[in-house]
């Protein structure tokens, strides 16, 4: 080996330093300093020479032990922007602790729109300085928030608040589907001439922008919610919204709320269909619809369904949502595989009013024809202090109506309806024939050869089978399907019908010989 010593310099690879976000300062250092300060105040001091966030042990943060370091780093880097988004949502949704920030935003918007040209002409150069100054204030605010809330629990709570406020902000649009957007687009295109006339004659573009902006910025304000709720009680307002947007936002079909739970169950059933479109469970599913009848006492008039404009409507569901009266109540829309039908013939009054009234065991708990004052719970003028007895201090009352419906598959429903309609139609037709004194020849038809064949074989003719289908309210396509799948049932019903006609003829033969001779000729 050579005696010359060679100095070897080791060069280690280093990762390029990632760009730290400027807003709120260096997030990692700010949070680390806050954690060290909290530890020092709590008497738990540890050496953190390398300054890594992962080596800071915080007793109040159990999430650190279960959260991967990669996720923790991502949350820490996202934390300043979550604070910024949370403050923006506070202002827009009017949910902050200080409501005046939202009011200031509204005033700033109005001033900018009304005096935009003047502001740009005389104060445009100062606007850039104002933006930089606002950014500096925002940077200091975020840095202070990072120092006061440096744990993962604070980040998780902030993410939850941002999620809830985002849902509030987007709540007017989450219920709009693709078809609703298409309908809104068509309506907007059709109303384009009216829009042009309004912007040309009545509202200039600046005024229109001001009105639309104020409506959007104050949509979630408390007084705006109250005003919309009061205006929505007027039918003319609901009709105006319907004709302008083309959307039924609960104004025309006001009973949407009562079907909310039912629609969720129907969607759940539809999702359980297999690849052949057949439900795994063919049993009908029953729903009990509940309507509450509300009345108010008027001096000199008595109990009437006329309610005050700001309170509940004469008919509501159990959640006080507006609902139709029993006479105007209709079942939800049918689907391709499921249909609705009533189990109870009529609406029945719940005499117990959902258990609030004790009913003797000898008395029925429901009644289809109650008296005008049965089943009511009485309240004071503000719907408080419920009582089973009426008194001079009671000015409002309500009672509970129930009716059960069931949801069945289309195939099961068609078979049951067809059979019931067929039986009732056959019985009705035989009764009419017996009343009118028709002979068996007139009933079976004029084709003698086909009647003789039917007599020999003991089966109905094709003409009679079609006649039964028409009597059962079956269309042509349904008749073809039943003719191929349920032919034996039709033939059996026809034989029963023929037997009934012959039995009636024999009975009339004993009472009237003329009818007997005509019947023998026909047979």
Curated annotation (Swiss-Prot):
The modification N-acetylserine is found at residue 2. The chain crosses the membrane at residues 91-111, 118-138, 184-204, 207-227. Residues 429-523 are annotated as: Disordered. Keywords: Acetylation, Membrane, Peroxisome, Phosphoprotein, Transmembrane, Transmembrane helix. It is found in: Peroxisome membrane. It comes from the Eukaryota. The modification Phosphoserine is found at residues 52, 420, 424. One of its GO terms (cellular component) is cell periphery. Belongs to the PEX28-32 family. PEX30/31 subfamily. This is Peroxisomal membrane protein PEX30. It comes from Saccharomyces cerevisiae (strain ATCC 204508 / S288c). The lineage of its organism: Eukaryota, Fungi, Dikarya, Ascomycota, Saccharomycotina.
């Amino acid at each position: 080996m050579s005696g010359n010593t060679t100095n070897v310099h080791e060069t280690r690879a280093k990762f390029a330093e990632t760009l730290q976000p400027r807003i709120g300062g260096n997030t990692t250092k700010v949070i680390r300093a806050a954690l060290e300060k909290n530890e020092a105040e709590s008497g738990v001091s540890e050496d953190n020479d390398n300054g890594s966030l992962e080596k800071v042990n915080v007793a109040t943060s159990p999430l650190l032990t279960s959260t991967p370091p990669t996720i923790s780093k991502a949350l820490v880097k996202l934390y300043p922007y979550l604070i910024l988004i949370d403050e923006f949502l506070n202002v827009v949704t009017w949910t902050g602790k200080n409501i005046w920030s939202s009011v200031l935003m509204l005033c700033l918007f109005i001033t900018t729109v009304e005096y935009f040209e003047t502001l740009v002409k005389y104060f445009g150069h100062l606007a850039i300085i104002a933006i930089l100054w606002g950014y500096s204030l925002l940077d200091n605010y975020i840095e202070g928030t990072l120092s006061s809330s440096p744990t993962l629990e604070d980040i998780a709570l902030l993410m939850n608040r941002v999620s809830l406020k985002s849902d509030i902000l987007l709540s007017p649009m989450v219920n709009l589907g693709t078809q609703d957007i298409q309908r809104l687009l068509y309506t907007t295109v059709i109303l384009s001439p009216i829009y042009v006339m309004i912007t040309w004659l009545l509202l200039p573009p600046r005024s229109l922008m001001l009105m639309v902006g104020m409506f959007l910025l104050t949509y979630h304000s408390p007084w705006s919610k109250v005003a919309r709720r009061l205006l929505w009680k007027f039918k003319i307002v609901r009709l105006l919204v319907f004709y302008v947007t083309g959307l039924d936002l609960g104004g025309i079909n006001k009973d949407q709320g009562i079907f909310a739970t039912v629609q969720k169950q129907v969607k759940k059933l539809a999702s359980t269909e297999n690849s052949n479109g057949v439900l795994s469970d063919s049993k009908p599913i029953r729903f009990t619809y509940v309507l509450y009848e509300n009345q108010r006492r008027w001096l000199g008039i008595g109990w009437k369904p006329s309610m005050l404009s700001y309170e509940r409507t004469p008919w509501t569901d159990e959640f006080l949502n507006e609902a139709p009266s029993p006479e105007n109540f209709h079942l939800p829309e049918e689907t391709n595989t499921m249909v609705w039908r009533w189990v109870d013939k009529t609406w029945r009054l719940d005499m117990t009013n959902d258990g609030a009234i004790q009913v003797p065991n000898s008395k029925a708990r429901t009644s289809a024809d109650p008296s005008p004052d049965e089943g009511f719970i009485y309240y004071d003028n503000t719907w408080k202090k419920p009582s089973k007895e009426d008194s001079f201090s009671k000015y409002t009352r309500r009672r509970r109506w129930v009716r059960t419906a069931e949801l069945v598959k289309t195939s099961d429903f068609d078979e049951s309806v067809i059979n019931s309609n067929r039986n009732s139609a056959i019985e009705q037709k035989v009764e009419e024939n017996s009343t009118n004194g028709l002979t068996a020849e007139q009933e079976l038809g004029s084709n003698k050869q086909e009647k003789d064949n039917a007599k020999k074989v003991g089966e109905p003719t094709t003409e009679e089978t079609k006649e039964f289908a028409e009597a059962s309210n079956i269309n042509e396509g349904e008749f073809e399907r039943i003719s191929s799948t349920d032919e034996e049932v039709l033939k059996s019903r026809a034989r029963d019908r023929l037997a009934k006609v012959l039995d009636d003829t024999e009975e009339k033969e004993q009472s009237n010989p003329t009818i007997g001779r005509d019947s023998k000729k026909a047979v």
